[in-house]
UniProtKB/Swiss-Prot annotation:
It catalyses: 1-(5-phospho-beta-D-ribosyl)-ATP + diphosphate = 5-phospho-alpha-D-ribose 1-diphosphate + ATP. HAMAP family: HisG_Long. Its EC number is 2.4.2.17. GO terms for cellular component: cytoplasm. Pathway: Amino-acid biosynthesis; L-histidine biosynthesis; L-histidine from 5-phospho-alpha-D-ribose 1-diphosphate: step 1/9. The keyword Nucleotidyltransferase does not apply. It is found in: Cytoplasm. Catalyzes the condensation of ATP and 5-phosphoribose 1-diphosphate to form N'-(5'-phosphoribosyl)-ATP (PR-ATP). Has a crucial role in the pathway because the rate of histidine biosynthesis seems to be controlled primarily by regulation of HisG enzymatic activity. This is ATP phosphoribosyltransferase. Keywords: Amino-acid biosynthesis, ATP-binding, Cytoplasm, Glycosyltransferase, Histidine biosynthesis, Magnesium, Metal-binding, Nucleotide-binding, Transferase. GO terms for biological process: L-histidine biosynthetic process. The keyword Glycosyltransferase applies. Feedback inhibited by histidine.
Amino acid sequence: MTTTNRLRIALQKKGRLSKDCNELLKQCGVKINWNEQRLIAYAENMPIEILRVRDDDIPGLVFEGVVDLGIIGENVLEEEELGRLARGEKIEYKKLRTLDFGGCRLSLAIDRDRTYNGVQDFVNSRIATSYPNLLKRYMNEKGVAFKSTLLNGSVEVAPSAGLADAICDLVSSGATLEANGLKEVEVIYQSKACLIQRAEPLSTEKQALVDRLLTRIQGVQQAAESKYIMLHAPKDKLKEITALLPGVENPTILPLANDSARVAMHVVSQENLFWETMEQLKEMGASSVLVLPIEKMLA
């Protein structure tokens, strides 16, 4: 277990999650002097220590209590869990929250010219993957017998190199598959980044710091999903407009100078289809509609 007085957090050193994790900490007000060559970094304004490691090492570091927190892709976390369960090893941790970045899917892909009729097409196929445990679980659920070929990188080249008949790999946009003459045919797992904590209780000071970080992370994510909306609204349409703009709390209503028929409305809304919403607001008689981004938010 970790004995340092600093809150120790494991992050991916390189790769798709690294920049997002760094940006999240920055948005949460954690000031860190990053040095690409150093594997340990320290916060300037909080008792926080960052360990920069390989992504597949993070679950084990949290399970064993070497670090207090870790940010990891759910796909890597569950792959490690399944492997440890198969070996009869103990798994203990707390999942604190799913984060709003690192989205991807684990998918089966085949040659783009091959006809696909369903998952039964993979019976007795050789499938190259870096996620053998997630693949095995999915295929067992579907009742499909197959042969797994473990590759830790460049999985997409396996079919053209004659190493496999198909692959099971992470997909974001699908551009890498297309570049290697493959097409996605089955999504077996959806993943995002998540924040996990070691199971053993933290000191009072460390837990208080974790709670502060969680509050800030929630504020950052809510701000990213929300907009601050200001508009002028007819008084007789307030009920309809309020229903159209679901807010975090009730809207603020202010009088307008020299206008007894309308009011100013301010609301923090999580409305997504906003061009359509603005058109509906205009139809209801709203005017001077302003939609502003929110940098930070504590609801």
